[in-house]
Amino acid sequence: MSEQLSIADARQAEAIGRQVVLQGWVRTRRDSKAGFSFLELNDGSCFGNIQVIASADLENYEQEIKKLSAGCSVSVVGLVKESPGKGQTTEIEATAVTVHGLADTETYPLQKKRHSFEFLRTIAHLRPRTNTFGAIARVRNCICNSIHQFFQEDGFLYIHTPVITTSDCEGAGEMFQVTTLELDKVPKTEAKVDFTQDFFDRPAYLTVSGQLEAEIFACGLGKVYTFGPTFRAENSNTARHLAEFWMVEPEMAFYDLEDNMRVAERMLKRIFRDVLEKCPEDMEFFNLRIDKTVIETLEKIIDADFVRLPYTEAVDILTASGEKFEFPVDWGTDLQSEHERYLTEKHFQCPVILYDYPRQIKPFYMRVNDDGHTVRAMDVLVPKVGEIIGGSQREERLDVLQQRMKEQNLEPEGYWWYLDLRRYGTVPHSGFGLGLERVLQFVTGMANIRDVIPFPRTPGTAEF
Amino acid sequence: MSEQLSIADARQAEAIGRQVVLQGWVRTRRDSKAGFSFLELNDGSCFGNIQVIASADLENYEQEIKKLSAGCSVSVVGLVKESPGKGQTTEIEATAVTVHGLADTETYPLQKKRHSFEFLRTIAHLRPRTNTFGAIARVRNCICNSIHQFFQEDGFLYIHTPVITTSDCEGAGEMFQVTTLELDKVPKTEAKVDFTQDFFDRPAYLTVSGQLEAEIFACGLGKVYTFGPTFRAENSNTARHLAEFWMVEPEMAFYDLEDNMRVAERMLKRIFRDVLEKCPEDMEFFNLRIDKTVIETLEKIIDADFVRLPYTEAVDILTASGEKFEFPVDWGTDLQSEHERYLTEKHFQCPVILYDYPRQIKPFYMRVNDDGHTVRAMDVLVPKVGEIIGGSQREERLDVLQQRMKEQNLEPEGYWWYLDLRRYGTVPHSGFGLGLERVLQFVTGMANIRDVIPFPRTPGTAEF
């Protein structure tokens, strides 16, 4: 009997001589005058195809096999042989080809020619069948797995923080509202929406971050991380913004900012190393077709120590650089992308962890330094992308935290439980957030963030 | 220098003789007349505590150590020694105890006495610090990790299907609406809501299932799984319903219903085996305090073959059983929980996979059998919980699928891309859904689903 094999396995030398069943989708068909056809078959298990040799002797050769075109689905039974061809180790000599589904060449939207990414977004249900989007799916899977393994091996607990929330982590942030009220007849009492008739008896939103809830678990169970979807209702139509994206947020009790930096650096290096090791074919494709620097960039980062630089020194470096920036550099304002890129690409030529930012530009939960002017914030900057991680040591002192909330006009009532964490058994703790899609953009070189998530949600777009 | 160690590691015999730093929260303090105090310390790394012996010679003994109570946070430096006490391998002789945060015994809500789970839900920010909820967090983490490993080892790709959606997988289902319109002044044109002013230019909802999108990826990349939050806006105040819960949905190209059953059975056994192996202390606790049958039940399932039983035969068995059921058994209606429990608990005394359900009670996407009356649906039933997995082979034939949609009054326009999967290179494929919280209830014996998710969302409740 023939054994079921993935094409990834069938392409290895070890498969030679085995009688197998392969199942997948035809990429191309080429007919030889010598009385057989070559099918390039892909099943998603790897970037490369396997070549199937289908002889004219097969009973359905004329009626079916010769009609196969890009997108058709087949099962192939046959013998794996050493391939005489270049760039492939094996090929399969078919003894049977079963056709499951055809794909009419007149109407099938994926033609042989190269399609623009813009066009492919309109057929997001078919784009996983292309080389580029198959590769993105595998690299995305690899990175997710790498993240989980990194934390699991280090004793972190994976926790699920809620998507539906009634609190707002950043104190600002544009949020989506979640409701079961009928929008064409919203109930009101005294001209105000009557939320007692809504599902949760109060206004509810989609979370912008699981950090505050992750702190709950860290402040009782030590080391935890979240990995889930987060949301921004910003009307940003850029290549770097999504309304729905995935975020990883580790949070560690008894970790200070230096510990936090070490976790962030180790995690990024682990991700990059895994991608290069486990997806070499996919990465070669990105390096060849999308951005000729991606592999070299990742390799350099894996070997380099990240620079640690206080914000204040960064401002000094930028001021003294003689560089012409569009935006002025001024202590007390956020750095712009051009400044971040100057630091990582020109000045240091490696990732930089900026820390100790001005108090007034950072959220209330970041720990205030003894100088009173700065807080224990950190941003990890990488070449080309800029900020890829943002984090901080959290303010664990109840009185200082309350003072900071007052400064930022936050109502303590909504944060009673967050304050309780400081009231009972408070501990120094730290954490950060990593946007999965930003990492994917960095790793693959893909210019538009809409192309590294299966089904992008952006203003006006929620198809599929 | 002392090395940082988790309490899980410090409790092992290998730690004896090492100079360590432990950090965590005090569970209890007991003072000996012999001039020292015993602290039970927990850091979340495992169920058990470590006993810290703090001598009166320590400089902060009177001022600080003797004030320690449940919930206080400390760092302890000391030597790990063999413990003369029963039920513990090691203990630590402190050379320094640093107090990070006290927890006023007058106001700290977690007192020594046992609290009801209802009460603990009102302090969900503190309940991870209890034995029960620490154990749940570790078992939940273990199960999530087990699920990822199971699929990763088998070549599945983890994919993220969207939370915000404009389609409704089940064709029915009560959904939450997602909007950026201001509810107190919803814009209207001709008495209808003007969705062109909403974020996505149309009504958008929270997903009830990622299945249809998972099918997209399976029908191009082979074997995939989703693992993410899903939502139901049902007004169900039961111990088994949540408005927000996590679901795992594998989807496999070229898999028929029998293949699907095999994946489901293997996955459940893998989860149960991992939990028993990796969380033995936590499971002993559940077995002792929550449900005295959980360990035995899991062990039996791991060793048993799941029974496969067509729905029609199940109806025959139930009808012939002589059992008095509250609801009548009738071919063509859904089985009730009492029927499912009779089959798994009394008749077979093991998990049962029911399959080939009546066409009229199942969704449009399930493959129609040759008999015309049944579809290739399957439900995995386990003792006590009943249905834990629901799945099916999907209808891959375009014409049959279109006919089924017509039967169920579904508009094909909304499903153009789903139909395209059958139009171009269609393949037999199958998948199922597993509710994470149901599994957790089954594994731990916890009666209420609100206690196995960090922050439950239910009608009227979205605190934290």
Residue ranges and their predicted role:
Chain A
Residues 2-249, 253:
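Class II aminoacyl-tRNA synthetase-like tRNA-binding/catalytic domains
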Residues 61, 278-282:
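Residue-level recognition of alpha-helix termini/interfacial anchor residues
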Residues 146-154, 267-278:
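Generic non-transmembrane alpha-helical segments
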Residues 164, 174-273, 284-464:
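A translation/RNA-centric and nucleic-acid-associated enzymatic feature enriched
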